[in-house]
């Protein structure tokens, strides 16, 4: 063992060993308990960033820990390889997306391997490879056969910059989630999967996810938007038409003063064909996103039609409103301005009647702006329902409407069907075709996969690609000429089932091998960012339910435990250029002046230009504040990065990247290295500890060791507070570095402690621990070692803190085992260096001892 810690030499050696011995490749083993740990697969953008490194380090720590518990651990890795960024990057670099993507994968794989992640690379998948998306296409045709997919002209979110459709979940504040450009609403033919058919199970099964973060589940509940209420069928006055309206509050029925329908309602469309004002209104407000509906000022137009109130028989006007959201299911709602703020604003603006029908509990005044969840109050101004509380009023109205056969209870959802077609080249071709008569037909199974046409130059639209390879678009199905569908799948399709394919990546006779999937699924631990809470994780759960219903997987949910790590933040600097745009500078090229607290007070470029400090913000290419993992590895080693990432912040919190913290971790590893180098004589420290003859210091050290094992085991295994686990290990190392090595017992305890420390650090710093382990055990690799087990009997021993005084003045406080005799306690404390100094050459006249509290030497 060399005296100096040299991470580069060690890490290269260890990584080569793992690669040569295929250490982390696994197979199904019914005799062993399985553990499937899955980090979200990366998009091969070109280089890993520290956000990736954090995600994958967390996953690797969990995987290595579970492996040490004796489990058969699967931790795979692959590439979410289709998508818009690769297509645009290929255009910029005058190449094709496939070549660009493969080049990036090669580089990023090398980066991952340099960080020592324990992946089973034999299961690597790349979603742009036909052998992967073949089965995605096959499954789509099965969904089509079961009428779970359909194509229709649809209002869609259109990004003019990217020239493609966005799902509702991909629109943030009215802008494209990727390029941040404003979206517009457009009507084009689109493919959809009926996720609304699964809305109830997606909502209810959230209760089964007991080990998912509550905020993620709440975000999904809100997006599904389950609304329980009633659908009432009303007669349109002086016509044969019926109008179905939705309400959550039957008790307020007597307060309805107008009906509000959306511009998308069938009645609105029909009226627009004859009424130019309605036509203009619909044109203005129909083509806005759901998100924008919440922001526009409420306005409307009178249809001059009426419905008949089902109880009073009075007529109620029908208005088309831009505030009636399609999320309510019927596009038509009862409006009760006396008890709803939005309805009140609309009524005041349009001079509509306002009627109050609920008194406050004290019966003194009408109750305004009643919440849908508010069930306190008394009905008035409601004819035969006057004086009833709201619950009784609801029941009485319900009976009347049921008797008329115009009422049914209904649950509506905000969740809309999943739009899965995209107008781009670099994606999975949708396996459908159209005959000359317009009939759609799925591509037959024996003609799958439908492989993308090869292109000779970069392009951004599939239609242009087809122009280069016109034969690709033409196909014969059952002897008839047909034209292929030219849209491609939303890339969320690929990332919705990859977890299942990892269990059988080389299975070529079907989508999923039932034997492998039954063994490995569900995923035991999934790790990814909170930004995926709605889009990816919703589709992920939905797709699993589809696979389940086709008997391809078991279980109702794909993942048991979900961990959402925080972002990685870094210092960012910019200046305003001549075009009033921000130009960002990487901190490595910035001259920084700090105050005594370490706070930045000035920053300049190398040329002396003054910069503005933007604070600690998320690492990103756009802000030029990313840190290259390779540079840190070269300087400090992969283990230092790994340990720093896991130590610097709780995994759910944002992590502030500071090189000073890296240096501190590096010093710790060097300190531990020297402790092993200096204090362990490998040949002479194999003697067993004689537990019958341990002095107090030895007993205390063993107590701290097993206390640390217990705490670290709980922190990693149950609490997932990895930073506190590392902190406990560091404390123990500090104690060991101060422990005297005077006799064989000391050496044996030191050996026991170091062995346990190495095992506990192994998930965090696997290269370091692999290497030093060889000096403790030449017979097996640490990769095959078991996690240390704490001894309960040691921790159950009781200790008391005894204050030592000389002539009544406190000199020290010492923790002492309650099992020691009074004489042993006296002797031990007298030999403490600080006490020994004061008692040297002094006669002790008396010892005053209060058990478990105070010992006072009187001289």
UniProtKB/Swiss-Prot annotation:
Motif 'HIGH' region per UniProt: ranges: 42-52
One GO molecular-function entry: leucine-tRNA ligase activity
InterPro entries linked to this entry: aa-tRNA-synth_I_CS (IPR001412), aa-tRNA-synth_Ia (IPR002300), Leu-tRNA-ligase (IPR002302), Leu_tRNA-synth_edit (IPR025709), M/V/L/I-tRNA-synth_anticd-bd (IPR013155), Methionyl/Leucyl_tRNA_Synth (IPR015413), Rossmann-like_a/b/a_fold (IPR014729), tRNAsynth_Ia_anticodon-bd (IPR009080)
Catalytic reaction list: tRNA(Leu) + L-leucine + ATP = L-leucyl-tRNA(Leu) + AMP + diphosphate
GO biological process, one term: leucyl-tRNA aminoacylation
UniProt GO cellular component terms: cytosol
Binding site for ATP: 621
Keywords (A to Z) from UniProt: Aminoacyl-tRNA synthetase, ATP-binding, Cytoplasm, Ligase, Nucleotide-binding, Protein biosynthesis
EC number: 6.1.1.4
Keyword Magnesium: no
Intracellular or extracellular location(s): Cytoplasm
Record has Manganese as a keyword: no
UniProt short sequence motif 'KMSKS' region, positions renumbered to this chain: 618-622
HAMAP family recorded: Leu_tRNA_synth_B (MF_00049_B)
Family stated for the protein in its record: Belongs to the class-I aminoacyl-tRNA synthetase family.
Name used for this protein in its record: Leucine--tRNA ligase
Gene giving rise to this polypeptide: leuS
